UniProtKB/Swiss-Prot annotation:
It catalyses: L-tryptophan + O2 = indole-3-acetamide + CO2 + H2O. It comes from Agrobacterium tumefaciens (strain Ach5). Pfam families: Amino_oxidase, RolB_RolC. Its EC number is 1.13.12.3. PANTHER family: FLAVIN MONOAMINE OXIDASE, LYSINE-SPECIFIC HISTONE DEMETHYLASE 2. Substrate binds at residue 295. This is Tryptophan 2-monooxygenase. Binds 1 FMN per subunit. Pathway: Plant hormone metabolism; auxin biosynthesis. The gene is tms1.
Length: 755
């Protein structure tokens, strides 16, 4: 049905002034003012409106929609004119306002969309995603800072896009209209103002699986120095902490600050810090090899809280691929990727496709799945409901996918992000080599798709940093802090715990020496393998519920190997060589690290092998570090001899200046970190919420990064201790600070969905 000729004609004779709403900064007021502007514009049409009213009385119906699309003039239920919004930057708006008459040509080619700038169920990032899918044009937030409200004829071409915009739990569709001058499709510019859709905040934000931000709680408790306390008439518990990694140290420290006097930490190894392990070289103590955690994203807000608290917040960028000159070796051919530039042409399809996916999401059949950027934006802006519902859709549709099958489904389907279908196995192998920002992800392709996607949404793949002092300085400073006259380190017993058992109302700890001790509460921060095999905690349901036991026993622990080499000089600077190398051989990822940037003549440090899973398992067959280094050097030499010729230890000292570690064979670890396989995200849920399950509190609590949704990241090792400490204080009659995780109303997900 064509639009009313009167409406078409009236749009050709535009009024001389739009309503200026740029000073309006409240969504509800903008809603009212925009609606009033449409009403006033219709009233000004005089004779034409009179005649339209006559048509209405003859069978046309006029109505205002609740979401701000006003007015609609319809016949037989088919809309003739409705409202829409063109989103533009301040500069484009200025050009329009300076033109007389209104410069319709300025907005030609743009897309008007039926989402109002006062819509609080839609974020700016979602708007960017929708406009790209409707127009094929990319926008930055600065390009969408303002809007022009228009009345547009239904004769304009339109496209409807199903997107996860929720109102009372229902899916809504977004409609876009292409603004063109051809065909004289009528539209009328009515008002202009600022886009008030939700924008990201500059502060911390919750992770997608928790939707609770621990950082504000820690900040709030900084004033009092404690997250809870015990009234004078309440007896304090006797507590054992198993493991002196970062989780165990945080637990002990927070309990001591809360007034718990009797705290004992049991550590099986001869050092503290666990996987926060910085090896200092004897001849250059300021050069440190990070044997465990080494990349620290600013989005790890709790980690940075503790770094700031202990004076370690000075960080430097980690030399990830593409952020520094990077040498790529694929099938024996060498490619140079200059810092800050696009990768070599061979890699463009996978590079552009992945980045398009991050911004644009995935269009599959009947729905657009929210882009990772849009979900992150929702978390930043506090739109928790939308973030939750969008993530649940990803869980529903991709929860049973491996990272490999998920990538195949997205990039080999009919709507591949970036517009180019990937080829198999060529693009597959290129993507495995290049990765998603922090190096090749090929070895973890069989991990769950959701497991990798959550890292992206949580911001852990962005702006990763390195700690100049070595990250083990953090657990060292926590351990050296004196609380109530005694340091945390003085409470550490370096002995292995062989069993943890219930004994009436107490918990019995049996040590390797045969000695047993009774405690009121126990926090276990050991690796999952030790919880099962050494502590024997999953043999029955006396301590943990069956689903928790299952999660401990079956969660996948990733194998990882590192080999560091300290060189006589920073040869990559001397000879202008790339400081990052990615290869498809046994030496997967090589990083050159400078811990003494102020000294050009200082020692160099090369992480010559950082491998995961199968690539790590292969290296276990070569346990001798000198032999392993020779194998890696020879492999690099075949493609990059100019680099390999410098890979010899300073002073030819293989004993002191080469260090390696295999986390899978570490008897106190049993793997580097937890990485869920497809369909196993409910294991993380069971492990994380165990300490918060007050209905099944047995006095034993789990903590540690492997008991979080972010295995392998220090952030999880800082949040789970908070859960355990809160549980102990609460269960023993203490008083917790407001806003604690125990009193939070958790918005849980269904992780056991079927595709």
């Amino acid at each position: 049905m064509s639009a009313s000729p009167l409406l078409d004609n009236q749009c050709d004779h535009l009024p001389t002034k739009m309503v200026d709403l740029t000073m309006v900064d409240k969504a509800d007021e903008l809603d009212r003012r925009v609606s009033d502007a449409f009403l006033e514009r219709e009233a000004s049409r005089g004779r034409r409106i009179t005649q339209i009213s006559t048509e209405c009385s003859a069978g046309l119906a006029c109505k205002r929609l609740a979401d701000g699309r006003f007015p609609e003039i319809s016949a037989g239920g088919k809309v003739a004119v409705l409202s829409a919004y063109i989103y533009i930057g301040k500069e484009i708006l200025g050009r329009i306002l300076e033109s007389k008459p209104w410069a319709r040509a300025t907005v030609s080619g743009l897309v008007a969309i039926d989402l109002a700038p006062f819509c609080m169920d839609f974020s700016e990032a979602q708007l960017i995603q929708a406009l790209f899918l409707l127009s094929g044009k990319r926008c930055a937030p600065i390009d969408l800072s303002h809007f022009v409200a228009i009345s547009i004829s239904k004769t304009a071409g339109f496209r409807t896009l199903p997107m996860p915009l929720y109102e009372n739990g229902t899916m809504k569709c977004v409609t876009g209209f292409t603004i063109t001058l051809e065909g004289a499709v009528p539209f009328d510019m009515v008002a202009y103002g600022r886009n008030l859709m939700l924008k990201g905040s500059a502060g911390s934000f919750p992770t997608i699986d928790l939707l609770y931000d621990y950082r504000p709680f820690f900040d709030q408790c900084s004033d009092s120095g404690r997250i809870g306390f015990f009234p004078e008439d309440v007896p304090k518990p006797k507590v054992a902490v198993i493991g002196a990694g970062i989780s165990g140290l945080v637990v002990a420290n927070e309990l001591l600050h809360a007034g718990v006097d009797d705290v004992t930490i049991y550590e099986a190894s001869d050092r503290v810090g666990g996987k926060l392990w910085s090896h200092a070289f004897r001849d250059a103590p300021s050069v440190v090899a990070e044997m465990g955690a080494m990349r620290f994203p600013p989005a790890a807000f709790c980690l940075f809280f503790f770094l700031e608290r202990y004076g370690l917040s000075s960080m430097r960028p980690f030399p990830n691929p593409g952020t520094v000159d990077t040498y790529l070796v694929y099938q024996g051919v060498q490619y140079m990727w200059k810092a800050g530039q696009l990768p070599p042409k061979l890699f463009h399809r996978v590079y552009n496709g992945w980045r398009a996916f991050l911004k644009d999401g995935f269009y599959e059949r009947d729905i657009v799945l929210a882009s990772p950027v849009a979900i992150t934006q929702a978390l930043k802006s506090g739109d928790i409901r939308w973030a939750h519902d969008s993530w649940q859709i990803w869980l529903n549709r991709f929860g049973r996918e491996s990272f490999s099958s998920g990538i195949e489904r997205i990039f080999l389907g009919t709507h591949p992000p970036g517009g180019e279908t990937w080829s198999f196995p060529h693009d597959w192998d290129l993507f495995k080599l290049m990765g998603i920002g922090s190096g090749g992800f090929g070895p973890v392709f069989e991990s769950g798709f959701i497991e990798i996607l959550r890292l992206v949404i949580n911001g852990y793949e962005e702006n990763q940093r390195m700690c100049p002092e070595g990250i083990s300085e953090l657990p060292r400073r926590i351990a050296s802090e004196v609380v109530n006259g005694v340091s945390v380190s003085q409470r550490i017993c370096h002995v292995q715990v062989r069993a943890i058992q219930k004994e009436k109302t107490k918990i019995k700890i049996r040590l390797k020496s045969g000695i047993s001790e009774l405690y009121d509460k126990v926090v276990v921060t050991s690796g999952l393998a030790n919880i099962q095999l050494r502590h024997c905690l999953t043999c029955d349901t006396n301590i943990f519920q069956a689903p928790v036991n299952q999660a401990v026993d079956n969660s996948h622990m990733t194998g990882s190997s590192k080999l560091f080499l300290m060189t006589e000089r920073k040869f990559w600077l001397d000879h202008i060589l790339p400081s990052c190398v990615l290869m498809d051989g046994i030496a997967k990822a090589v990083y050159c690290l400078d811990y003494e940037p102020q000294d050009p003549n200082g020692k160099g440090l090369v992480l010559i092998s950082y491998t995961w899973e199968d690539d790590s398992h292969k290296l276990l067959a070569v346990p001798d570090k000198k032999e392993r280094l020779c194998l890696l050097r020879d492999a690099i030499s075949r493609s990059f001899p100019a680099f390999a010729q410098h890979l010899f230890p300073a002073c030819a000292d293989y004993d002191q200046n080469v260090i390696q570690h295999d986390w899978l064979t570490d008897e106190n670890a049993g793997g580097a970190f937890k990485l869920n396989r497809r369909g196993e995200d409910f294991y993380s849920e069971e492990l994380f919420f165990q300490a918060l399950d007050t209905a099944n509190d047995t006095g034993v609590y789990l903590a540690g990064c492997s008991c979080s949704f972010t295995g392998g990241w220090v952030e999880g090792a800082n949040r789970t201790p908070c859960n355990a400490v809160c549980a102990i204080i609460h269960n023993c009659g203490g008083i917790l600070a407001k806003g604690n995780p125990l009193e939070h109303s958790w918005k849980r997900y269904n992780y056991r969905t079927r595709n």
